[in-house]
């Protein structure tokens, strides 16, 4: 929706961005910090489930270095993707990819935990400009 409350059209997006995301997630699983950095725009922003915000490639790479060095050992698996384009305020078209991803990591007690994440990813060209992350714990069987 626009700032005045009118609905913006949502269109099927370019599925070419899906492979960029798959490669980006694989770079995380491979701990390939250079590969991760090359996909992001310099002014990238990430909005985390707990309310945290990471701005810029350098800050994100430092965040990942610490996380990858921890005992959590995070691993991601892409479950689904939906590509969409839509008009933003002012009429410019934005390119987004919405993805469902499972992340598995070790908690403080060493137990393996799985969370289901939805990532809304904004692309500018072939670079990731913004990621909004939403999360819920996996159901216990």
Mark where each language-model region is.
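Hydrophobic pocket/interface hotspot
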Residues: 24, 35-37, 44, 60, ...
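Short beta-strand edge/turn micro-motifs at domain boundaries
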Residues: 114-141
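Short, low-complexity N-terminal intrinsically disordered segments enriched in polar/charged residues
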Residues: 1-34, 38
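A short gly/proline-enriched turn/hairpin at secondary-structure junctions
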Residues: 7-10, 43-55, 70
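Acidic helix-start/capping segments at beta-turn-to-alpha-helix junctions
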Residues: 39, 47, 51-56, 79-88
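Sec-exported extracytoplasmic/periplasmic mature domains
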Residues: 25-30, 38-45, 65-73
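Short beta-strand segments enriched in hydrophobic/aromatic residues
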Residues: 40, 97, 101-105, 119, ...
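Surface-exposed, charged secondary-structure patches
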Residues: 64-109
């Amino acid at each position: 929706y626009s700032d005045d409350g009118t609905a913006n059209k949502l269109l099927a997006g370019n599925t070419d961005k899906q492979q960029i995301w798959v490669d980006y997630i694989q770079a995380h699983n491979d701990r390939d910090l250079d590969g991760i950095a090359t996909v992001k725009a310099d002014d990238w922003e990430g909005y985390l489930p707990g309310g945290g915000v990471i701005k810029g490639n350098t800050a994100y790479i430092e965040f990942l270095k610490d996380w990858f060095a921890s005992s959590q050992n995070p691993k991601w698996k892409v479950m689904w993707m939906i590509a969409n384009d839509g008009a933003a305020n002012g009429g410019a078209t934005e390119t987004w990819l919405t993805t469902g991803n499972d992340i598995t990591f070790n908690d403080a007690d060493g137990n393996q935990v799985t969370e289901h994440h939805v990532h809304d990813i904004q692309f500018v060209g072939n670079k990731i400009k913004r990621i909004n992350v939403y999360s819920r714990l996996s159901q216990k069987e």
